[in-house]
Amino acid sequence: MSKTNSETGNNFEQQKQELIAALKACGAVRYGDFTLASGKKSKYYIDIKKASTDPKTLKIIARQAALRIKEMDVDTVAGVELGGVPLATAVSLETELPLLIVRKSVKDYGTKSRFVGDLKPEDRLVMLEDVTTSGGSVRDAIEVVREAGASLKYVITVVDREEGAGEKLKEADVELVPLVSASDLLK
């Protein structure tokens, strides 16, 4: 028996509330004066790297992302160093899909590759991101993956700060799938 859209919507709402409670309980939401990766100033900071070190919160994130992935035509889970790696690793374990780590730059030793893991031109990836603001950080990783010939149409973010990332990714033909929005988290 399949679930109705109403049941699925209620389930996603329950999951969102569970994740919000976990993020707050592990201390991932902080207030003060912060500078974001984009250079913008903010009165709050969402520390998903801290949440990633809490096994209960990381498990909730992985489980919820895995449920979204079931609706996508993908065969590889990717994450950008540093914040996306624990998320993508946990989701890879949950979904049993292969993991790809995207480095921010080429190392001048070892394989000298931007990728850790196998990437083939026919691969269809979903990228995991900790927090999205403007979408600039993840855009570089999307371009590198696409230059290698693989397809990337989805970015799952734990928290979307609702400051333009969705629109910027849409321009690149990528759908942003937030588990939680900042406005929901900060209520």
From Swiss-Prot:
Keyword line: Glycosyltransferase, Magnesium, Pyrimidine biosynthesis, Transferase
InterPro entries cross-referenced by the UniProt entry: OPRT, Or_phspho_trans_dom, PRibTrfase_dom, PRTase-like
Disulphide bonds in the chain: none
One Gene Ontology biological process: pyrimidine nucleobase biosynthetic process
GO molecular function: magnesium ion binding; orotate phosphoribosyltransferase activity
EC numbers: 2.4.2.10
Similarity-based family: Belongs to the purine/pyrimidine phosphoribosyltransferase family. PyrE subfamily.
HAMAP family xrefs: PyrE
Quaternary structure note: Homodimer.
Function: Catalyzes the transfer of a ribosyl phosphate group from 5-phosphoribose 1-diphosphate to orotate, leading to the formation of orotidine monophosphate (OMP).
Official protein name in the record: Orotate phosphoribosyltransferase
Biological source species: Methanosarcina mazei (strain ATCC BAA-159 / DSM 3647 / Goe1 / Go1 / JCM 11833 / OCM 88) (Methanosarcina frisia)
Gene: pyrE
